[in-house]
Amino acid sequence: MKNLAQSKYSSALETVRNLKEKYGTSWNAINSESAARMVTQNRFKTGLDIAKYTAAIMRKDMAAYDADTANYTQSLGCWHGFVAQQKMIAVKKHHKTTSKKYLYLSGWMVAALRSEFGPLPDQSMHEKTAVPSLISEIYDFLRQADAIELNDLFKRLENGEDVQDQIDNFETHIVPIIADIDAGFGNEEATYLLTKKMIEAGACAIQIENQVSDAKQCGHQDGKVTVPHEDFIAKLNAIRYAFLELGVDDGIIVARTDSEGAGLTQKLPVSQEPGDLASKYLAFVEAEEIGINDAKEDDVLLKREGKLVRPVRLANGLYKFKEGSNIDRVVLDCITSLQNGADLLWIETPTPNVQQIATMVNRVKEVVPNAKLVYNNSPSFNWTLNFRNQVFEEMLAEGENMTGYDLNNLMDEVYDTSELSYRADKKIKTFQVDGAREAGIFHHLITLPTYHTTALHMNDLTEGYFGEEGMLAYVKGVQRQEIRKGVSCVKHQRMAGSDLGDAHKTFFAGDKALKAGGTNNTSNQFDVSEKPKKVKAIVEKVA
């Protein structure tokens, strides 16, 4: 949000001046302008301030999407505050605004990268406090990005540059975060307590899934077990109560269903009357008709349409759903969640197929017309292969000769310049636009991009650095790219807060301050504006 820095500075300046007058000479060392600068550079004082601010942004964006599906939003998953900071700095640099660009906190990455137990699978085995801790860390880094950029602008203003308008219209790096609470880490009270911590850390949107908490699996793996709707609704209520208690009245709940790929349920809900929610859930459970004399000791029996049936129960006590019931269960999950307090939906799917997603969402919209989806553009999908397969089937249906393609080997590089590859890549490129328009997708996210980019970059750097290229691998592949692309971290001392700290030391100690940013600081080598002066000096010396 813009146009607040100026009023913030003026208000802070007046406040400090009044305080100095109130407390007299004991405050003589406090410079009103310096204090006002520090207030301006730290707009958000608490995580709750952030949650309220970002919730309002999401609500506005949701309304904009309802009016025009071109107004969809996006995010990338981040596993460290620094990663989130660099993402938002890059967003501002390349796109000139943070509008409709969010952050995503993935439970998968918390488990894999942030647990004190070491790397873990996505099964809710990591300590639950790691989730709010990461949210807090992310917003600490984003607030520092604000402070660094504004500090630079104030320095330029002091040096006579005309940057007042940039200060007055400064856009914060703080954006909404959709935070993954898995299945709630326990019962509804546990969900409520953890949600409070996440909101207090700054989260305005909580994503919760309908799996059994202590048997949770990654949405793209087998063995998923879902809970009856009554249990899930209790957790939706717990999240809403947490938002209301903390004064984040616009807080967003994202209800995720894993039913598309889940074939098991842990327990059978109690139906109070035919056709109620529990009855609808029980209708999906696979059962075999039996006579009363065929029942075994301790069998669980149900009466269905006047007949006795025995639910199919596995050796571990779990009950099995009917084959082919998954899509109907997804639709019922979504409708039920929206009718019981959820704001957005999340449907885990086996492949990224717009038409398949739209088929489910459109059924939901028949009951809840403004239903909107958060969709996981997951790295668990082989995007290249999925879309080449889709296009292969389309081209075949169009009557094209496909004998030149091996359907079992479409990932082969030999097809990279083919018509099939061109059409597949075009569909990947427009997937998010198409999904927003046709499948009700309000928010597109990639859960684990920075997990994969870290691995890829280390693969590329180590190949050359420990090989024939040596130091050139780093210089050519990293530093030179940072310089030429204007990546802020090329001056890593500044990004870590060194210049900001020097400014603070000057405020605190005046001329006695021992600062890091002097002429002997090697970061000066990256100051492009000084290069012509150095070259000129060398030429004059040679002459």
Predicted features by range, described:
Residues S7-A439, L445, K505, A509-F526, ...:
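Alpha/beta enzyme core
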Residues F243, A278, E463-E469, A543:
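Non-catalytic helical/linker scaffolds that mediate oligomerization, partner binding
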Residues K476-A543:
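C-terminal functional modules
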Residues K2-L4:
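Terpene synthase/cyclase
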